[in-house]
Amino acid sequence: HSKQKGRLHPFEILSIGGDDVFLIVPAHAALPIATTIAEEAEKALSGRPITRRDKGYEWTRVHRIQMPYETKPTVQSKVGLSSGVVIAHHCTPVFFLRRLVEELLKSAKGKAKRLRDKGYYGATVDFLVLKSTAMIATNIHDFRRSALKRNNLHLTAKPYTVPELYALLEVVKRLKREDFPRSQLYRLREQLEKGWLASIVEYFYFQARLRSSEEVRKALDKVWIGTEQQKGPKSIGLWMRRENDDPENYEFETVLGDL
């Protein structure tokens, strides 16, 4: 990984086999390292004729963020290095971490496969912050369905494409630069539990009275706009339209629960 302020991050390679790599790195650097590996792998492979794809994709149909540049991607790699990332305490058993990572990787690859139908061949990343081993009673899918879903609302937007994950990390950096109160962030997250309308009202009220609200808008709802939908309600406030198999049953998701 590239140097950060003149230092290299320590890491441990537990296994390399086939196209899978299992690494242990410092928690604060795990997501930046995952995005860097995916991006560098794609750059290298897109320069080789056998893995180069001279065809772009429609940004607004793939990524849920504003396009950060004017030109659309025109060259891709046919191979993307998706990742599963677990951020956990150092004493967590490795065998348990590996099981969770494999679940997350399967989830990330599932999204990558669906996005191929839209012409996107890049990597995706799914991650989990594990507070205790008792947090996941069965598997990650069941945990998210019970703890992070309220009717048609998903309190998470995972998995992410690599550009989306970069944008999410930028949100964190911007909020830190502005000394954004964590208590306010926790309060906004609590409002998500109350439902779509209540959380939107609280969010707009919060924006009206907070001095740094413009920075929050720049980092969140001016960046996270959701993908282009053919019909139905659009994204509003902290909620983005979620794509599902049944376009008649509208679902929403938010990145706020992932910050």
Residue ranges and their predicted role:
Residues 1-259:
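Charged, helix-rich terminal subdomains or tails
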